[in-house]
């Protein structure tokens, strides 16, 4: 296959760090270094330093929406960015976000007539619920999201669970599972680095060490972990637990841990950006605890597997895909009692944990080179299908945009009419209440006058 020029589009990119930004960075680095040529297109950021990358990064105008959605929102209808990209000779466009990035990608497709692939990474229904309070507007946002995704020539998801989530939003088209990779090599780091990284914590070698790495948010299942550890301690088991990461719920989580009386056994390490130091924690631990049903990919589970560390996961979760219970990981129901029971069973079986970790390393590990290589091969098939006219024709974004604006205006009119009707109702109730108060005051005056006449 000839070398391809790939346009990678995403809403987040360094200095903003998340799983999708990491995926796009790896796609660009591997394609540009080994396979073809890649350009990243992403919103502008005043703190960005793109000189550090060995591939082109093209920025377009943005708004600061970090407090609302965690990253800057791009303005995809910028004519300047379209003019800049139009002459770059791209063979394919690959969007990694179904909102503004895909809007920009659709406009670019109309100009340069190449196929558009979109990867669905995260559960956007949760993001929509967090960002929009109105149920009516939430449903309309989901409809527009699905419409935007369906307008792509091919849709990929990072896991089967991500595909099921996409279906739950109303998407009815086909999709291909294209998993992400891990930027760790398979194997352990040096013992000297492990000792250096973990030296500040009370971690006796004779005790099992449990580990969590990720954002410190309750929706990651952290309450299940802490409640299970409290049960474990009450049962007389001795152990150690380390949480590595930052996040909006970190202080609440630490306070809850203190309330449970676990501070002698549970330690909190801030977020670590040095990847080898994170590997050191994976290599030091006996078991990785990740009872999250939120994540669509469970990348940290594959990171742990790269280091030979087995995970305890919720059966049926995306993170547990391809994991065989007792062979390449340990599966439980989504509650603290199940977690506690499994940990009690394993506390005295450190060799079993090690053997299962070795199987996880062999069965679950996927390098980014392998993951991007698969995607790059699929690019060739997508381009061929597009040129042969095998994908359905999609309406122009301008048509969709006009309809979306009309629908949004109708929703706004409906919302405004409801608010105005409610305001009129409140005014009427206020007038009635005011009149009732006047009448009540008059009755009280008359009653007092009658009593005074009686006694005077």
Residue ranges: model-predicted function:
Residues 149, 271, 279-285:
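Short alpha-helical donor nucleotide-sugar binding micro-motif in glycosyltransferases
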Residues 310-314:
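Short hydrophobic beta-strand element within catalytic cores of glycosyltransferases
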Residues 58-61, 138, 143-193:
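Donor nucleotide-sugar binding/catalytic pocket of nucleotide-sugar-dependent glycosyltransferases
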Residues 352-366, 370, 377:
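A short, well-ordered alpha-helix in the C-terminal region of glycosyltransferases
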Residues 254-272:
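Nucleotide-activated donor-binding/catalytic signature segment of Leloir-type glycosyltransferases, i.e.
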Residues 293:
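Aromatic "clamp/platform" in nucleotide-sugar-dependent glycosyltransferases that forms part
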Residues 1-59, 369, 404-456:
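N-terminal subdomain of nucleotide-sugar transferases
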Residues 325-326, 330-336, 345-350:
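Conserved acidic donor-binding segment of nucleotide-sugar-dependent glycosyltransferases
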């Amino acid at each position: 296959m000839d070398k391809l020029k790939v346009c990678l589009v995403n809403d987040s990119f360094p200095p903003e760090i998340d799983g999708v930004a990491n995926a796009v960075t790896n796609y660009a680095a591997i394609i540009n270094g080994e396979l073809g040529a890649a350009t990243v297109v992403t919103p502008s950021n005043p703190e960005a330093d793109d000189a550090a990358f060995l591939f082109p990064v093209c920025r377009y105008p943005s708004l600061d929406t970090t407090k609302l959605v965690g990253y800057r929102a791009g303005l995809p209808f910028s004519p300047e960015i379209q003019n800049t990209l139009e002459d770059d000779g791209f063979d394919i466009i690959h969007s990694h976000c179904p909102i503004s990035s895909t809007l920009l990608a659709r406009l670019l497709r109309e100009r340069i007539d190449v196929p558009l692939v979109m990867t669905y990474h995260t559960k956007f229904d949760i993001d929509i619920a967090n960002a929009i309070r109105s149920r009516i507007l939430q449903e309309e946002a989901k409809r527009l999201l699905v419409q935007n995704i369906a307008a792509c020539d091919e849709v990929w998801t990072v896991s089967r669970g991500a595909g099921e989530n996409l279906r739950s939003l109303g998407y009815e088209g086909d999709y291909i599972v294209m998993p992400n990779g891990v930027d760790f090599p398979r194997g352990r780091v040096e013992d000297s680095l492990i000792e250096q990284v973990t030296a500040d914590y009370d971690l006796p070698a004779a005790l099992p060490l449990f580990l969590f790495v990720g954002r410190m948010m309750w929706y990651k299942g952290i309450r299940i972990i802490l409640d299970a550890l409290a049960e474990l301690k009450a049962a007389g088991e001795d152990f150690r637990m380390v949480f590595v990461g930052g996040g909006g719920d970190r202080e609440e989580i630490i306070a809850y841990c203190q309330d449970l009386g676990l501070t002698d056994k549970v330690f909190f390490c801030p977020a670590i950006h040095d990847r080898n130091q994170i590997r050191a924690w994976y290599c030091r631990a006996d078991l990785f605890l990740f009872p999250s049903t939120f994540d669509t990919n469970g990348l940290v589970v594959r990171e742990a597997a790269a280091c030979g560390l087995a995970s305890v996961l919720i059966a049926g979760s995306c993170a547990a895909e391809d994991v065989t219970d007792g062979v390449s990981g340990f599966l439980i129901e989504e509650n603290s009692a199940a977690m506690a029971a499994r940990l009690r069973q394993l506390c005295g079986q450190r060799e079993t944990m090690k053997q299962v970790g070795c199987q996880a390393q062999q069965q679950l590990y996927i390098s980014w080179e392998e993951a991007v290589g698969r995607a790059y091969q699929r690019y060739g098939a997508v381009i061929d299908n597009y040129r042969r006219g095998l994908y359905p024709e999609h309406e122009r974004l301008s048509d969709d945009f006009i309809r979306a604006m009309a629908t949004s205006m109708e929703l706004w009119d409906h919302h405004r009419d409801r608010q105005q009707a409610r305001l009129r109702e409140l005014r009427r109730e206020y007038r009635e209440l005011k009149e009732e108060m006047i009448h009540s005051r008059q009755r009280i005056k008359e009653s007092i006058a009658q009593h005074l006449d009686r006694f005077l």
